[in-house]
Design a protein with these regions (language model features):
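Generic detector of contiguous secondary-structure segments
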Residues: 72-76, 92
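Alpha-helical residues within the helix-turn-helix
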Residues: 63, 74, 80-81
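N-terminal helix-turn-helix DNA-binding core of bacterial DNA-binding proteins
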Residues: 26-70, 94-102
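Beta-hairpin "wing" of winged helix-turn-helix
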Residues: 80-90, 97
Length: 145
C-alpha cells in the first residue's frame, strides 16, 4: 500500500503520511486551540502579559486596567480555568499570576514578540532567538500530541 497521496504533487516531498495522521487527530489540537481562544481577547492578553511579570490582586488589576473588579474577575476566572494563570488566597485577597510552566513562559515571550515590546526584565534581541523561541514553543505545544 502506497500510503497517503495528495491529488497534486508539487514536488515538496516530506512526510505527508505523518502530517496527515496528525491532522486527522483533531483532539491533539484542542488544547492549543483553547489557549489561543483565551488569548483572542485583548483584555485577556493585557491581563496575561501583566501577570507574567508580577502577581496581583483583583483590586489592583482593576485599577491598572481601569476596569471594574467584576469584569476583571470574569477574565481571571476564564484564564485560570484554561491553565494560563494560577491563584492563591491570602486572607480575603486572591492573588493571580501566570502559571510557572515552560509553555506559559513561551506564550509570554510570543505575546511580547507579536506586540514588539520588551519584557521589563529582559529584551529579546535577534531574529535567530525569535525563531528559536517559536520552534521551542511549537515543540512544547506538540510534545504530548
Amino acid at each position: 500500500m502506497a500510503g497517503f497521496v495528495l491529488p497534486h504533487d508539487h514536488g515538496e516531498g516530506g512526510h505527508i503520511e505523518d502530517l496527515h495522521r496528525e491532522l486527522m487527530n483533531a483532539a491533539h489540537f484542542a488544547a492549543a486551540s483553547e489557549i489561543f481562544k483565551q488569548l483572542s481577547d485583548p483584555t485577556r492578553v493585557r491581563i496575561f502579559w501583566l501577570l507574567s511579570h508580577r502577581e496581583e490582586c483583583v483590586i489592583n488589576l482593576a485599577a491598572l486596567l481601569e476596569m471594574s473588579s467584576p469584569a476583571v474577575s470574569h477574565h481571571l476566572r476564564s484564564l485560570t480555568e484554561s491553565g494560563l494563570l494560577v491563584s492563591r488566597r491570602d486572607g480575603k485577597e486572591v492573588y493571580y499570576k501566570a502559571a510557572d510552566t515552560a509553555q506559559i513562559r513561551m506564550l509570554h515571550e510570543i505575546v511580547e514578540q507579536v506586540m514588539e515590546i520588551a519584557c521589563p526584565e529582559r529584551a529579546v534581541d535577534s531574529q535567530a532567538s525569535q525563531e528559536a523561541i517559536i520552534r521551542h514553543v511549537h515543540d512544547e505545544l506538540t510534545a504530548d500530541l
